[in-house]
A protein has these predicted regions:
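Conserved phosphate- and dinucleotide-binding cores of soluble alpha/beta proteins
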Residues: 75-188
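N-terminal active-site beta-alpha-beta segment that forms phosphate/nucleotide-binding
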Residues: 1-71, 75-81
Length: 188
């Protein structure tokens, strides 16, 4: 990761990862995040609400339009948090996204991007990362959206669909952090 200009950290527990993530977010920052069970389960969102941050939370939108506006506003946050669908052993991030808001923010958005990655997401190559993203992550992620009617919702595996409900519209491989240390990766 460091050879690819990412800032990298390893934490052996989720509590250590939570502590490290909070250290990387300056007080007073506007902060938002992409859909991530990793971030939610480690307690990071809850910790942010207890801290001195301006929170941009698309889930607080009451209507589809409000949710969309909050997702767009997240692109301009000071700090953006996410996980990744896969991390190759040579340090490349692999992500699949439905609307593109998460991968857009990671690629060219906030000045401070923090990615939390479980060791279960580490794969040999970026090609293996795409396989993991399509055949493991996407079928699990679509379960969070009960209204989606995709083949993987039923079969549990990617069917390479072109459904209007598809959550795999964008596949992005981040091979380098163009601005050194803009993207911080915490492996837990």
């Amino acid at each position: 990761l460091k050879n690819r200009n990412f800032d990298a950290y390893y934490c052996s527990t989720k509590d250590q990862a939570l502590e490290q993530a909070i250290k990387l977010i300056p007080e007073g920052n506007s902060v938002s995040w992409g859909g991530s069970m990793t971030i939610k389960h480690m307690g990071l969102i809850e910790a942010l609400y207890q801290g001195n941050y301006e929170i941009i939370d698309r889930d607080k939108g009451q209507t589809p339009q409000e949710k969309k506006e909050l997702a767009q506003k997240a692109f301009f946050a000071d700090t953006y948090l996410s996980s990744t669908n896969a991390l190759s052993e040579d340090g490349q991030l692999v992500n699949i996204d439905g609307y593109g808001n998460r991968v857009a923010a990671m690629s060219f958005g906030p000045e401070n991007v923090i990615i939390i990655v479980g060791v279960n997401k580490i794969v040999k190559s970026w090609e293996d990362g795409i396989r993991r993203a399509r055949h493991t992550a996407a079928p699990l992620n679509v379960q969070r959206f009960p209204g989606k009617k995709t083949p993987c919702m039923t079969t549990g595996t990617c069917e390479n669909c072109t459904s209007n409900d598809c959550i795999c519209s964008y596949i992005v491989i981040t091979r380098m952090c163009n601005i050194p240390k803009r993207i911080k990766v915490i492996i837990v």
